[in-house]
From Swiss-Prot:
This is dCTP deaminase, dUMP-forming. NCBIfam families: dCTP_deam. Belongs to the dCTP deaminase family. It comes from Streptomyces griseus subsp. griseus (strain JCM 4626 / CBS 651.72 / NBRC 13350 / KCC S-0626 / ISP 5235). Its EC number is 3.5.4.30. GO terms for biological process: dUMP biosynthetic process; dUTP biosynthetic process; nucleobase-containing small molecule interconversion.
């Protein structure tokens, strides 16, 4: 069940959903807007001949931060990691989906490539996978609205929520845009 604005506010007021910093004006009819932080992870395309999700490649990305009040420029065809300004914390019986903002999508900005789902129990900044599909560069201003979180009520609490010992939960508590840790639990079935 998708939560309405009334239900979102009630979950935040009860302390079950934490959004820090919280701005009540960001609550929409069935979502809550999130803003862009000021840190970006850009890919160092010359460090490796290819990306291998089975292998740790620590120099694949590096963190950059725009100076002062400057924007980050995302060029056509470019892909970078960023994160929400807000820290998001979910209880064991709510999951979330990060969706892009329609107005930004109409400019060619993709907010997340594939990983828009946030498990119950997650706590941290949400990493964004930003791509520019437009033919012109896009200015990304730290603090601008970048997406919206939709909250979903589970039929029951997760038995093993994100952050529990059963799962490695390698992104729990992440700060800023976090590089892929796919090598930590890489699985391949012989076919």
């Amino acid at each position: 069940m998708l939560l309405s604005d009334k239900d979102i506010r009630a979950e935040i007021d009860a302390g079950r959903v934490r959004i820090d910093p919280y701005d009540p004006s960001m609550v929409q009819p069935s979502s809550i807007d999130v803003r862009l932080d000021r840190y970006f992870r850009v890919f160092e395309n010359h460090r490796y001949p290819h990306i291998d999700p089975a292998v740790e490649q620590p120099d694949l990305t590096r963190t950059v931060e725009p100076e002062g009040d400057e924007a980050f420029i995302l060029h056509p065809g470019e892909f970078v990691l960023a994160s929400t300004y807000e820290v998001i914390s979910l209880p064991d019986d709510l999951a979330s989906r990060l969706e892009g903002k329609s107005s930004l999508g109409r400019l060619g900005l993709v907010t997340h490539s594939t990983a828009g789902f946030i498990d119950p129990g997650f706590s941290g900044h949400v990493t964004l996978e930003l791509s520019n599909l437009a033919t012109l560069p896009i200015k990304l201003w730290p603090g601008m609205k970048i997406g919206q979180l939709c909250l979903f009520k589970l039929t029951s609490s997760a038995e093993f929520p994100y952050g529990s010992e059963r799962y490695e939960s390698r992104y729990q508590g992440q700060r800023g845009p976090t590089a892929s840790r796919s090598f930590q639990n890489f699985h391949r079935t012989q076919v």
